[in-house]
């Protein structure tokens, strides 16, 4: 009986480990398994050191707004978090309003399709995805619009992941991905029939620089839409709790200082855009975008147990636990930012590049 009990116990443990890692582990689109977690383009033995360097650099986000090293550390950030994002969140690295009766996956797709509907592109036209990540939005937008989408991301590992997903989805004929800095894009002037950026330009040290580049590569008369991360009119810089929440979001998301909602249209006009529409998509009647974060707390704890185990046995690189812990804390700051109304990740601005350059 002792032998039978031992085998049964071993079987139950093996089954539990398999369930944790292989059943609960994959992200909603099954792009990653927990056992595949890595440091992106960073070798496993350097993940811990790179995390420490990242965390030290972003301790005081407001003091690094003009730092030349920001793009390099944004690249480091996405090497550290891309696998965890895919595994625990999905292939679309952004938020969306909760839609009653719809799954998180469907709500995400609706949010993405709205972006391309706003810029009114036709099948076959060329559009830019500025800050494309692993291409979740790109694939949804290409499938919906039949436009030719070119995405740019600063992270080479994300380029590899995006191309893999594009091919698996049968959308590689519509989706192209290049590695580059959206502050200095490798595209000619007047290349694209439209452009969008979904929660990505927040990584730019200066919004004017990335908006100028997007303006440059767009054709005259074309439209650009962006979902911006901003502090709202409710934010008070003299409120210590407000400051703590915003700094927590900045540190945990590689942001060189969040911008005020009031700065977005001003910057767009400064680089030459005509502002067609501006709206905070997080405001009522939209349902709370942070519900998914709150409802996923059990999953976060489960995932953290998985990460600790995998790190302990050498499957996941050292430092992965630190990265996951950082993201868990950041999720709490994001939730507090949403609940208090001082932060929005979806301040939408729709702009047009004039047919003729202003005199």
Swiss-Prot record:
Keyword Methyltransferase attached: yes
Domain of life per record: Eukaryota
Keyword Transmembrane helix in annotation: yes
Entry keywords, A to Z: Lipid biosynthesis, Lipid metabolism, Membrane, Methyltransferase, S-adenosyl-L-methionine, Steroid biosynthesis, Steroid metabolism, Sterol biosynthesis, Sterol metabolism, Transferase, Transmembrane, Transmembrane helix
E.C. no: 2.1.1.143
CDD domains, sorted: AdoMet_MTases (cd02440)
Places the protein is found: Membrane
SUPFAM superfamilies named in the record: S-adenosyl-L-methionine-dependent methyltransferases
Pathway info: Steroid biosynthesis; sterol biosynthesis
Residues that span the membrane, as ranges: 4-24
GO cellular component: endoplasmic reticulum; membrane
Species for this entry: Arabidopsis thaliana
The family this protein is said to belong to: Belongs to the class I-like SAM-binding methyltransferase superfamily. Erg6/SMT family.
Name of protein: 24-methylenesterol C-methyltransferase 3
GO MF term (any one): sterol 24-C-methyltransferase activity
A GO biological process held by the record: methylation
InterPro entries noted in UniProt: Methyltransf_11, MeTrfase_SMT, SAM-dependent_MTases_sf, Sterol_MeTrfase_C
Top-level EC class: transferase
Biological function: Catalyzes the methyl transfer from S-adenosyl-methionine to the methylene group of 24-methylene lophenol to form 24-ethylidene lophenol.
Membrane topology: Single-pass membrane protein
Originating gene: SMT3
Catalytic reactions on record: 24-methylidenelophenol + S-adenosyl-L-methionine = (Z)-24-ethylidenelophenol + S-adenosyl-L-homocysteine + H(+)
